[in-house]
């Protein structure tokens, strides 16, 4: 093992990277409330793992979506547990995100020179809420259907562009298969991809600038 490590160390300077990670200064005023962002990240990773597991059984069609969720909950080994963890972790992720935003705002973490960190954080907050909205509809039960109908109908109040925007969100004039396909694509591909872009940016900025001092 020593020879293998030496080969990697010679080429990649692993020890220098490890020292940089472990020797980062942590201000003395930091408390448990500064862990809310990390808890949000942990919830997101749980979401990725459990969501990936559910894609093996979920069928994104209006005729089979609800039945596939029922099958997952009643027939698949530990399927009920996987979906329950996914649902609980989703609620926890939204809650921790909200508390994290409040903590950052109240401690002045959005001020110069951390404006871009704040901007990426707000984008991640919007993505988190979008995950909740799109995921809520995927079982395609009565709650999910009417939630989608209400949410996608809100932009209709916007003058001129309201109706075209509603049709863009739904994929047609009414809520149906096109809507479910759009929400499934958003939930499982587009939103995770955007999160994978902005989350490293957010953490790298925090890593570079450090934790802000007390007010």
UniProtKB/Swiss-Prot annotation:
<feature type="transmembrane region" description="Helical">
    <location>
        <begin position="32"/>
        <end position="52"/>
    </location>
</feature>
<dbReference type="InterPro" id="IPR027387">
    <property type="entry name" value="Cytb/b6-like_sf"/>
</dbReference>
<dbReference type="InterPro" id="IPR023530">
    <property type="entry name" value="Cyt_B6_PetB"/>
</dbReference>
<keyword id="KW-0249">Electron transport</keyword>
<dbReference type="InterPro" id="IPR016174">
    <property type="entry name" value="Di-haem_cyt_TM"/>
</dbReference>
<feature type="transmembrane region" description="Helical">
    <location>
        <begin position="116"/>
        <end position="136"/>
    </location>
</feature>
<feature type="binding site" description="axial binding residue">
    <location>
        <position position="202"/>
    </location>
    <ligand>
        <name>heme b 1</name>
    </ligand>
</feature>
<dbReference type="GO" id="GO:0045158">
    <property type="term" value="F:electron transporter, transferring electrons within cytochrome b6/f complex of photosystem II activity"/>
</dbReference>
<keyword id="KW-0479">Metal-binding</keyword>
<keyword id="KW-0150">Chloroplast</keyword>
<dbReference type="GO" id="GO:0016491">
    <property type="term" value="F:oxidoreductase activity"/>
</dbReference>
<keyword id="KW-0472">Membrane</keyword>
<feature type="binding site" description="covalent">
    <location>
        <position position="35"/>
    </location>
    <ligand>
        <name>heme c</name>
    </ligand>
</feature>
<comment type="subunit">
    <text>The 4 large subunits of the cytochrome b6-f complex are cytochrome b6, subunit IV (17 kDa polypeptide, PetD), cytochrome f and the Rieske protein, while the 4 small subunits are PetG, PetL, PetM and PetN. The complex functions as a dimer.</text>
</comment>
<comment type="similarity">
    <text>Belongs to the cytochrome b family. PetB subfamily.</text>
</comment>
<dbReference type="InterPro" id="IPR048259">
    <property type="entry name" value="Cytochrome_b_N_euk/bac"/>
</dbReference>
<comment type="function">
    <text>Component of the cytochrome b6-f complex, which mediates electron transfer between photosystem II (PSII) and photosystem I (PSI), cyclic electron flow around PSI, and state transitions.</text>
</comment>
<dbReference type="GO" id="GO:0009535">
    <property type="term" value="C:chloroplast thylakoid membrane"/>
</dbReference>
<keyword id="KW-0602">Photosynthesis</keyword>
<keyword id="KW-0812">Transmembrane</keyword>
<feature type="binding site" description="axial binding residue">
    <location>
        <position position="187"/>
    </location>
    <ligand>
        <name>heme b 2</name>
    </ligand>
</feature>
<keyword id="KW-1133">Transmembrane helix</keyword>
<keyword id="KW-0934">Plastid</keyword>
<keyword id="KW-0793">Thylakoid</keyword>
<protein>
    <recommendedName>
        <fullName>Cytochrome b6</fullName>
    </recommendedName>
</protein>
<dbReference type="GO" id="GO:0015979">
    <property type="term" value="P:photosynthesis"/>
</dbReference>
<feature type="transmembrane region" description="Helical">
    <location>
        <begin position="90"/>
        <end position="110"/>
    </location>
</feature>
<dbReference type="GO" id="GO:0022904">
    <property type="term" value="P:respiratory electron transport chain"/>
</dbReference>
<feature type="binding site" description="axial binding residue">
    <location>
        <position position="100"/>
    </location>
    <ligand>
        <name>heme b 1</name>
    </ligand>
</feature>
<feature type="binding site" description="axial binding residue">
    <location>
        <position position="86"/>
    </location>
    <ligand>
        <name>heme b 2</name>
    </ligand>
</feature>
<keyword id="KW-0813">Transport</keyword>
<keyword id="KW-0408">Iron</keyword>
<dbReference type="Pfam" id="PF00033">
    <property type="entry name" value="Cytochrome_B"/>
</dbReference>
<keyword id="KW-0349">Heme</keyword>
<dbReference type="GO" id="GO:0046872">
    <property type="term" value="F:metal ion binding"/>
</dbReference>
<dbReference type="InterPro" id="IPR005797">
    <property type="entry name" value="Cyt_b/b6_N"/>
</dbReference>
<feature type="transmembrane region" description="Helical">
    <location>
        <begin position="186"/>
        <end position="206"/>
    </location>
</feature>
